[in-house]
């Protein structure tokens, strides 16, 4: 069965559906890591992707953005000069009422009878102004880190912006 377009799941129409103990089976999350880079160093600059609309972001989109950002940062900044963190977790379970198509589908398909749907994936529910990704780095790498985060924004289903925060000088 083909994957449905992300626009079907983007809006927060109903309350969160997260109680996995009542579900027959939920596909695993594609997100492999939530923290990347140098985790021990404290960096003075934090760059974050902040979403401009309340929406749901599928786990596949989060993973695609993570891969794009991480790969660009490793290539441009170096593995030891940044810390990348995913700030959301895909708790919400997405459901789909599968429809049969083709010849004779009307004999096989149940239509809208028992239309609750089966779990097909997960999504993170984010509010307007919430941070989705954050990168901590040194001041000399800020421009390259912004380019990397811009690459990640293209993979998200909502408008977003990059916010820079600097630690106060001691």
UniProtKB/Swiss-Prot annotation:
Q: What is this protein called?
A: Large ribosomal subunit protein uL16
One annotated GO biological process: translation
Which of UniProt's keywords are assigned here? Answer: Ribonucleoprotein, Ribosomal protein
Output the InterPro entries linked to this UniProt entry.
Answer: Ribosomal_uL16, Ribosomal_uL16_arc, Ribosomal_uL16_CS_euk_arc, Ribosomal_uL16_dom, Ribosomal_uL16_euk_arch, Ribosomal_uL16_sf
The keyword Nucleus belongs to this UniProt entry's keyword annotation: no
A GO cellular component entry from the record: ribonucleoprotein complex
State the Pfam families in the record.
Ribosomal_L16
- Sequence similarity: Belongs to the universal ribosomal protein uL16 family.
The terms under GO molecular function for this entry are: structural constituent of ribosome
Checking PANTHER family in the record gives: 60S RIBOSOMAL PROTEIN L10
Keyword Ribosomal protein in the entry? The reply is: yes
């Amino acid at each position: 069965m083909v994957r449905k377009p992300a626009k079907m799941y983007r809006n927060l129409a109903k309350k969160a559906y997260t109680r996995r103990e009542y579900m027959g089976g939920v596909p695993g999350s594609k997100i492999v890591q939530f923290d990347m880079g140098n985790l021990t160093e404290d960096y003075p600059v934090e760059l974050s992707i902040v979403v401009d609309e309340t929406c749901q972001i599928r786990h596949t989109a989060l993973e695609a953005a993570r891969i794009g950002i991480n790969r660009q940062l490793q290539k441009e900044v170096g593995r030891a000069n940044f810390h990348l963190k995913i700030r959301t977790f895909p708790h919400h379970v997405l459901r789909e009422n599968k429809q049969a198509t083709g010849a004779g589908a009307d004999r096989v398909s149940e239509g809208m009878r028992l239309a609750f749907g089966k779990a097909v994936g997960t999504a993170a529910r984010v509010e307007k102004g919430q941070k989705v990704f954050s990168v901590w780095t040194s001041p000399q790498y800020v421009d390259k880190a912004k380019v990397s985060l811009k690459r990640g924004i293209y993979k998200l289903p909502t408008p977003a912006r990059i916010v820079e925060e600097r630690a106060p000088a001691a």
